[in-house]
Amino acid sequence: NSPGYPSNVQFVFNMGGAMGDTSWLEAGDAPMVAFHPVGDPFAPYGVGNVIVPTTGQFVVEVGGSREAIRLSNEKGNNACFANAGFTDALTTYANTVNEGFEGLYPLYTNPAQQAGPWEWFDSTATVFYASFLPPPYNTAGGTAYSSALITNPDMSKAKALAYLDTIMGYLNPRVVYCLNLS
């Protein structure tokens, strides 16, 4: 762990990420919930390659959200919420598409190959703030915004907030339940 940061993690959640080495997961680790676009072109939903968004270059094979949650369930780490009896609409939906992996919320996007549908930012602000960076990055704001649209073509605040609402609606009851916060 990094010096100065505590390592007594009590709950983990992930949005579109992956584990560099799934052997890091051990029985007794914190419960885990993950949200992941199934067609994410950069970080695999299952087991696969991480790709650099700007170059398309291979980085490393990793375990995506599906694999991390599968292993977390296999090791009993999600037992605190697996049988909690959640019956809300988000849980009901997740359970129809997550192959029985409690804590996994697959995101089926349109178009299918999207990364980070919960992201949005203002093109004017992006260009403006980039102008304060040293060359050659000071002219990259427009490129950054245009590149983001490739994998999130209908990016908007309304879309992002709808995804974040779903994420919070599914995640928060599990955190509250497992950490006895009610």
Regions found by a protein language model. Give the residues of each.
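Generic detector of intrinsically disordered, low-complexity, polar/charged segments
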Residues: N1, N14, V97-G100, Q113, ...
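Primarily recognizes the serine-hydrolase "nucleophile elbow" in alpha/beta-hydrolase
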Residues: N1-G28
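Extracytoplasmic/secreted proteins, especially bacterial periplasmic and envelope-associated proteins
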Residues: N8, G63-L71, T166, Y170, ...
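Sec-exported extracytoplasmic/periplasmic mature domains
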Residues: G17, N73-N77, V176, N180
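Alpha-helix initiation/capping motif
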Residues: D21, E26, P44, E61-G64, ...
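Active-site-adjacent alpha-helix of alpha/beta-hydrolase-fold enzymes
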Residues: A30-T124, A130
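Catalytic active-site module of serine/aspartate enzymes centered on a nucleophile-bearing elbow/loop
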Residues: T109-S182
